[in-house]
Curated annotation (Swiss-Prot):
SUPFAM superfamilies: Adenine nucleotide alpha hydrolases-like (SSF52402). GO terms for biological process: cellular response to starvation; cellular response to UV; response to salt stress; response to stress. GO terms for molecular function: molecular adaptor activity; protein homodimerization activity. Pfam families: Usp. This is Universal stress protein C. It is found in: Cytoplasm. Required for resistance to DNA-damaging agents.
Length: 142
């Protein structure tokens, strides 16, 4: 089976390059499309900050996340069609984006080594609820 519209869930970590490389290896032979989704930290979890500071911090975090995605795309050696930066529960956003944009494969990474950690990760929630195929890629740290 070939996949032509792939969504890659990345984190702002170097291991995300492995996920994008996997997506490129799947998409390139069929000239498929790749999009990225990531989660930006929500500064509201730092509730001791005043409201005006929260908005400034949210803007900075969004810019840093976008810069990371831009660098990841630049190094990919293959075009990336869309990027999505989500706030909140990543698995919910992945499912929503898949439905709206008709992705046929979601690629997620897993660097958790214990069974308990794997059972509680966002990827498990995506796998349980997804209407499209999900590829869980084991990640190796540098």
């Amino acid at each position: 089976m070939s996949y032509s519209n792939i969504l890659v869930a990345v984190a702002v970590t170097p291991e995300s390059q492995q996920l994008l490389a996997k997506a490129v290896s799947i998409a390139r032979p069929v000239k498929g499309h790749i999009s990225l989704i990531t989660l930006a930290s929500d500064p509201e979890m730092y509730n001791q900050l005043a409201a005006p500071m929260l908005e400034d911090l949210r803007s900075v975090m969004h810019e840093e996340t976008q810069s990371f995605l831009d660098k990841l795309i630049q190094d990919a050696g293959y075009p990336v069609d869309k990027t999505f930066i989500a706030y909140g529960e990543l698995s919910e956003h992945i499912l929503e984006v898949c439905h709206k944009h008709h992705f046929d494969l979601v690629i997620c990474g897993n660097h958790n080594h214990s069974f308990f950690s794997r059972a509680s990760c966002s990827a498990k929630r995506v796998i349980a609820s997804s209407e499209v195929d999900v590829l869980l890629v084991p990640l190796t740290g540098d």
